[in-house]
Amino acid sequence: MVQIVISSAGAGGLAEWVLMELQGEIEARHSTGLAGNLLGDLHYTTEGIPVLIVGHHILYGKIIHLEKPFAVLVKHTPGEQDCDELGCESGTRYLVTALIKNKILFKTRPKPIITNVPKKV
């Protein structure tokens, strides 16, 4: 039988993340990829509607509550140093760092923000 040890972060409570769902594809300008880079600005209107601004485009979305929340896990495999201090009988552990209970769905096409483009003279 396989046992997976999962523990939570403690009494401080877990962070709550939000999942963002976009239609289509997002490409980076450079070949470095999107990891670790700023995607855009997320704002909320006074009515609570999420607004995502990416470059010169704006997207309007809606918040959807997930029926089954997701847990964000961090895998911790004990190294030789951990084995000496704590003993190696426990094996791999997973730590719950955050919960995802809501997602923001952007299902419409992005609208351009720039309205007037200067013409060449």
From Swiss-Prot:
Q: Where in the cell is it found?
A: Nucleus
Q: Name one GO molecular function term.
A: DNA binding
Provide the alphabetized UniProt keywords. Cell cycle, DNA replication, DNA-binding, Nucleus
GO BP annotations listed: DNA replication; mitotic sister chromatid cohesion; positive regulation of DNA-directed DNA polymerase activity
Q: Which InterPro entries match?
A: Ctf8 (IPR018607)
Q: Which domain of life is it from?
A: Eukaryota
Where is the chain membrane-spanning? none
An example Gene Ontology cellular component term from the record? Ctf18 RFC-like complex
Function of the molecule: Chromosome cohesion factor involved in sister chromatid cohesion and fidelity of chromosome transmission. Component of one of the cell nuclear antigen loader complexes, CTF18-replication factor C (CTF18-RFC), which consists of CTF18, CTF8, DSCC1, RFC2, RFC3, RFC4 and RFC5. The CTF18-RFC complex binds to single-stranded and primed DNAs and has weak ATPase activity that is stimulated the presence of primed DNA, replication protein A (RPA) and proliferating cell nuclear antigen (PCNA). The CTF18-RFC complex catalyzes the ATP-dependent loading of PCNA onto primed and gapped DNA.
Sequence similarity: Belongs to the CTF8 family.
- Tell me, how does this one assemble? Component of the CTF18-RFC complex, which consists of CTF18, CTF8, DSCC1, RFC2, RFC3, RFC4 and RFC5. The CTF18-RFC complex does not interact with the Rad9/Rad1/Hus1 complex. The CTF18-RFC complex interacts with POLH. CTF18/CTF8/DSCC1 associate with PCNA. CTF8 exists as a dimer with DSCC1.
Q: What is this protein called?
A: Chromosome transmission fidelity protein 8 homolog
The lineage is: Eukaryota, Metazoa, Chordata, Craniata, Vertebrata
Q: Which gene encodes it?
A: CHTF8
